[in-house]
Every structure is written in C-alpha cells, then in structure tokens.
Swiss-Prot record:
Gene: rpl2
Listed Basic residues bias regions: 13-25, 224-240
Pfam families given in the database record: Ribosomal_L2, Ribosomal_L2_C
Family: Belongs to the universal ribosomal protein uL2 family.
Function summary: One of the primary rRNA binding proteins. Required for association of the 30S and 50S subunits to form the 70S ribosome, for tRNA binding and peptide bond formation. It has been suggested to have peptidyltransferase activity; this is somewhat controversial. Makes several contacts with the 16S rRNA in the 70S ribosome.
GO molecular function, one term: rRNA binding
Keywords: Ribonucleoprotein, Ribosomal protein, RNA-binding, rRNA-binding
Species of provenance: Methanococcus maripaludis (strain DSM 14266 / JCM 13030 / NBRC 101832 / S2 / LL)
GO CC annotation terms, alphabetical: cytosolic large ribosomal subunit
Protein name: Large ribosomal subunit protein uL2
Length: 240
C-alpha cells in the first residue's frame, strides 16, 4: 500500500504543514475605529521595533496617548521615539494613518482596509506600496502593487509611506539551509520534490527505470484522494 500524498497530509493538517503562528509577536492591525479617529486624531509613540518571524517587514510597538499599545507595520525612515498620528485630521506624513478619502492623489500608501475598521488587509509585505489614483462620491480608487485598480470606501484607513524592509529579495540565499530555515517560519514545505523523482510507494508518478509519468496525467474530479495528482478535471492539456 502506498503512502499518503503531500496534498493529503497538508489537508489533514499535520505539524509539518501547520503554520507556526505561536512564534508571532501578535496581531498587526490598526486600533479600533472610534470617535477619536473619526472626529480628530490620536498621537502614538514608537517605543520599540521588532522582528516578527514569518513576516517580511519589521513591526513597531506603538504606545498611544490613551496608554493603549499596538503592533503596527512601519514605513521606511521611522525610528524609535518618533510620533505617529491616527485620525481624519492627521498630517500627510510617512507613518500616519488616515482614511483614504483624506489622502491626496498620487500619495503612496500601505496596509489598506477593505472594510472600514477591519484593521488593514492589503499591501502589507516589505517594500510594497499602493497609490491613491482618484476620489469620487462615496469611493476612492487605489492602484495596488499588482497593477490592479481597486474601488474602496473612502472611510477605509491606510498608512502613508512605503513598508519598511524593501530590497530583501536583492540578497541571494546562497545556501539551501538558509532558505529552508527562512521558509520554516511559514507554512511552506521546502524543497518541493517532483513526483516522477519519487519511489513508486510515495507517488502515482514514481518508480521506473527513468523519470516519466507512465500514465495519463488527466484525472477525474471524483477520483480517489491518493490518485488525484496532475491535471485534475482538465478541459484540455498541452500548448494552445
């Protein structure tokens, strides 16, 4: 009898494929959207900058004027001791948090909310930023790093600036061990072995005197889990 496929183990949720979220510093999101931010602003001070395992950007611990502490994504150029502002009347300055409707066109922003008060969902990776393209009645258009333009509620908050940690991809890993430990902080199994390179007991494409599939790669949508590899319920295969 063959062994479980990687996709079966991943679906079961074994420790190897489970994200090690217990190593994280905590939730990185905006403070609750209260009247203080809707009508004015609240000041916060950066008291520490932390490395968060599994995240491509550093996070800052910010203490606000009401003694509330939050972990937030910081932009390039922010250091310990600097003040940030959150609210509708905040200044347009890197690190400050404002509703999209109050940010001028062409300003780079990150950590954008999709629903007002959700804490920030879009553009959170190191070195990333989006641009506010235009404003209209009841909507703001933002161009994301992918080039896609998204229509959002003007009350959705965003941070002015570019996420810190840019240029992280410019330095090569050089050694396989470094890449392994880097990806072990995420729910990524690495390296990824090809099915034809495995033994017959490990994969439907394994075994044989040379590396070949040896059977059709198209399988039914309703086939058994241990055989469901390759082109699943494909309408067509090959070059168009």
């Amino acid at each position: 009898m063959g062994k479980r496929l990687i996709s079966q183990n991943r679906g079961r949720g074994t420790p190897k494929y489970r994200s090690p979220t217990h190593k994280r510093k905590g939730a990185v999101k905006y403070r609750s959207y209260d009247e203080m931010e809707k009508d004015g602003k609240i000041l916060g001070t950066v008291i520490d900058i932390l490395h968060d395992p599994g995240r491509s950007a550093p996070v800052a611990k910010v203490k606000f004027a009401n003694d509330e502490e939050r972990l937030v994504l910081i932009p390039e150029g922010i250091q310990v001791g600097e003040e940030i502002e959150c609210g509708i009347s905040a200044e347009i300055k890197p690190g400050n948090v404002l509703p999209l409707g109050e940010i001028p066109e062409g300003i780079p922003v990150y950590n954008i909310e999709t629903i007002p008060g959700d804490g920030g969902k879009l553009v959170r990776s190191g070195g990333c930023y989006a641009h506010v393209i235009s404003h209209d009645v009841g909507k703001t258009i933002v161009r994301l790093p992918s080039g896609f333009s998204k229509v959002l509620n003007p009350a959705c908050r965003a941070t002015v600036g570019v996420v810190a940690g840019g240029g992280r991809k410019e330095k090569p890993f050089v050694k396989a061990g470094k890449k392994y430990h880097s990806l072990s902080a995420k729910a990524v199994a690495w390296p990824k072995v090809r099915g034809v390179a495995m033994n017959a007991v490990d994969h439907p494409y394994g075994g044989g005197r040379h590396q070949h599939i040896g059977k059709p790669s198209s399988v039914s949508r309703h086939t058994s889990p241990g055989r469901k590899v390759g082109h699943i319920a494909s309408r067509r295969t090959g070059k168009r």
